[in-house]
A protein has these predicted regions:
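Charged C-terminal transducer/switch regions of large nucleotide-driven machines
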Residues: 1-62, 257, 264-269, 277-424
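Pre-P-loop entry segment of helicase/translocase ATPase cores
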Residues: 38, 44-198, 268-289, 449-456
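Flexible glycine-/small-residue-rich
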Residues: 98, 129, 142, 264, ...
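Conserved helicase NTPase catalytic core signature
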Residues: 119-187, 311, 354-495
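Secondary-structure-rich domain cores
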Residues: 168-258, 468-523
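Hydrophobic alpha-helical scaffolding
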Residues: 185, 233-236, 286-293, 300-303, ...
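Conserved RecA-like ASCE P-loop NTPase motor core of nucleic-acid helicases/translocases
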Residues: 213, 218, 222-225, 229-250, ...
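Conserved helicase motor core of SF1/SF2 NTP-dependent helicases
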Residues: 484-498, 505-688
């Protein structure tokens, strides 16, 4: 059969090469029963096939690749002579001929042909961002614009990465099926669990991680689940300590051999030099009965999930109970002449009492009287006395209903609170999380031990990072990098499965674009309440001038918007999870931040042991102040009044808005103890 005119697919054969049988067939025709009669070139015999087993496709469409890209299994393909698309209903199959004469047949799900180049999305947005990179990008020692070079490496035809939607593509962001089992080898709480689930089921997800809420822990759990599914992961940040923190936590669990810390030339060179040509011994990671541990992890996740739901419900019920008691108190004062005939309403469901109360209040407002049918209906539901009270004194009956509702709802909440509290006490959340963490980590290590069998390991050169990217990512599925170097870590024909962008509030828009171009999915992590990236006055003038020239949407304003802020406004359909549980500061310190900046949404998980002066203000007296970026009076107060009180009480940190002030303090104290808000942000100090 002519493979350019028809395609015969044997659906019973799962392997790509075996299921396409066109070139093996001499003739094909339909039998009277509706099946297929086939004669192969290798035999004169005629074989009969069930109709459902074979697809006989004709009239292929020649695909025009002009201004389009071809990607097979997410790898960019060049040197294509011809693409034929065979279609039937929702199924597509491709026959691809390369310029060297080689041909291959592929399932449609393995082939992606782009629609519109991403530089054509969103009007002038791409040109604007590229201009920002050209005019304000960081330069290396040889005065080469690093950012502009990164922009030139972006594959503009690849429109199935999040950058496309960021630039204005109206295509809906993809969602993914939830994995059958999600693992938490680094521990979890309610909001971290929600953040991990959102990351695994959405092309783009955003995690707001205020300080001390376990942001790194959440990132590690996402990485672990992606590793279990054999995905490649790029972790980027403008802050070196953020990616190093991820590396350290992975090393603590013996997983550092999966990590390649790349980015700039120095890091790449160090990685190449330090490669170990064999795998670590992972025999002890292999489980004799992984199914038992898997079942335990599943059971513990179900218990923990229920307990998280219980905790949330407990908090809601407590809030409702407190509000109800306050309402009841004022209602009792107002209805001092409560009708005593309400005992018969005891133990009636509060929802029914509220329903009738709303009906009665509406009738009073509309000066109506209840019909006989309505009175009979409610007397049937709540009891016979309802009939006479509805027909006689409606206002008095409203007072009875109000009192009965408060008593009924109060009793219901108390029962629910008691049941949930008992359940939480019985299950022991802390113990269950420990068992979930332990079993998850065992399964992760078991899977890795099975995948990376001990023995010799491939050693890569700098060129291999580009030319053998697929093989490299199988060996090192976790790559760490600066955001600036996001798309220079592997060859341009490849992208990562996921990019995780940490400290996104400190990344500027033009740099964040690079990271969105080099992965199929993005997890954007930051905190829009923290300080954004610093924009100098000189840079702001240049940025505003460029924006005025291109007239772009304000969501791309590089002066007023960090990358995180832009993403929050652009990716409206992406889930945003706030990590609420705070583990670092004293409750009084975090509660100040909570009320001032986080609308009371954070939950302190630390204990207030009644310490004195946890948070205090020291006012300086008049004299020797400066109006600029240096203040000698404040330095004197710090040295003479503040430090003597805390010098023997653990580590200290001094934060000041200005670098000049920090340098002066460090010079006088002869130690690196003071820094600016930007430098300290995200660092951990016991006292500061």
């Amino acid at each position: 059969m002519d493979a350019r005119r028809c395609m015969i697919v044997d659906l019973e054969k799962k392997d790509d090469k075996q299921m396409f049988i066109t070139e093996q067939v001499e003739s094909i025709q339909q039998s009277k029963s509706g099946g297929w009669l086939i004669r192969f070139r290798s035999s004169p015999r005629i074989f009969q096939y069930n109709k459902a087993r074979l697809l006989y496709l004709t009239q292929p469409e020649v695909v025009n690749l002009e201004e389009k890209g071809l990607y097979i299994n997410n790898i960019r393909i060049a040197n294509v002579a011809e693409i034929l698309r065979f279609s039937m209903r929702q199924s597509n199959f491709y026959r691809i001929t390369y310029t060297n004469g080689f041909t291959e047949n592929l399932l449609g799900k393995k082939v992606y042909i782009t629609r519109t180049p991403i530089d054509k999305q969103g009007g002038s947005t791409w040109d604007y961002l590229k201009k920002l990179a050209e005019e304000t990008g960081l330069c290396d020692e040889e005065e080469n614009n690093i950012l502009s070079k990164g922009y030139n490496l972006i594959d503009l035809k690849r429109d199935n990465v999040p950058l496309s939607q960021f630039l204005g593509d109206k295509t809906t962001l993809k969602t993914h099926s939830k994995p059958k089992q999600i693992y938490f080898p680094f521990g979890c709480n309610a909001s971290q669990k929600a953040a991990v689930e959102a990351a695994l089921t959405n092309q783009v997800s955003i995690i707001q991680g205020p300080p001390g809420t376990g942001k790194t822990q959440t990132i590690l759990n996402i990485i672990a689940n992606l590793l279990l599914e054999d995905n490649s992961i790029l972790v980027v940040s403008n802050n070196n300590s953020a990616v190093e923190n991820v590396a350290e936590k992975l090393e603590r669990e013996g997983l550092e051999f999966l990590v390649a810390q790349l980015g700039n030339s120095e890091n790449k060179g160090e990685f190449i030099r330090k490669q170990i040509p064999y795998y670590p011994d992972m025999k002890r990671w292999e489980l004799e009965e992984p199914s038992v541990i898997k079942r335990l992890a599943k059971e513990k996740l179900q218990i923990v999930s229920q307990m998280f739901d219980d905790q949330t419900e407990l908090a809601k019920l407590k809030a409702e109970y407190n509000a109800l008691i306050t309402e009841k108190k004022y209602n009792d004062q107002f209805n001092i002449r409560i009708i005593k005939d309400g005992d018969w309403l005891k133990n009636k469901p509060s929802v029914k009492l509220m329903e009738l109360l709303n009906v009665c209040q509406l009738m009073v407002e509309q000066s109506k009287k209840p019909s006989l049918w309505l009175s009979l209906k409610w007397s049937f539901i709540l009891g016979f006395p309802t009939l006479s009270l509805l027909r006689k004194d409606l206002s008095g009956f409203i007072a009875v209903l109000e009192n009965a509702y408060y008593e009924a709802r109060k009793s219901e909440i108390e029962k629910d609170l008691d049941a949930i509290t008992t359940r939480l006490h019985y299950n022991n959340l802390e113990s269950s999380i420990k068992e979930l963490t332990s079993s998850s980590l065992q399964l992760l290590k078991h899977k890795i031990a099975k995948r990376y069998v001990g023995g010799n390991r491939s050693v890569f050169t700098i060129k291999d990072l580009r030319l053998k990217a697929q093989k490299f990512l199988k060996e090192y599925p976790i790559v760490l990098s600066s955001t600036y170097k996001s798309n220079t870590n592997i060859g341009p024909d490849y992208v990562f499965d996921y990019v995780i962008m940490d400290e996104a509030s400190q990344i500027d828009i033009k740099t964040g674009v690079l990271a969105l171009s080099c992965a199929m999915n993005a997890v954007i992590v930051g905190d829009d309440k923290q300080l954004p990236n610093v924009v100098s006055q000189e840079e702001a003038l240049a940025l505003n001038a460029i924006k005025a020239t291109y007239k772009v949407d304000n969501r791309y304003n590089a002066v007023t918007h960090s990358f995180l802020k832009s993403c929050l406004e652009i990716f409206k359909e992406a889930p945003m999870t706030l990590l609420r549980e705070h583990y670092r500061c004293h409750p009084k310190i975090i509660e100040f931040c909570n009320q001032q900046f986080y609308d009371g949404e954070l939950i302190s998980m630390t204990t207030d042991s009644g310490e004195d002066n946890v948070l205090q203000v020291v006012r300086t007296v008049k004299g020797n102040h400066a109006r600029g970026h240096f203040n000698q009076r404040e330095i004197d107060v710090i040295i003479e009044e503040v430090l003597p009180k805390y010098i023997d009480k653990g580590s200290l940190g001094i934060i000041t808005p200005y670098r000049e002030q920090a340098q002066a303090i460090n010079k006088i104290l002869k130690q690196d103890i003071a820094s600016t808000v930007h430098k300290y942000q995200g660092r951990e100090h016991h006292r500061g």
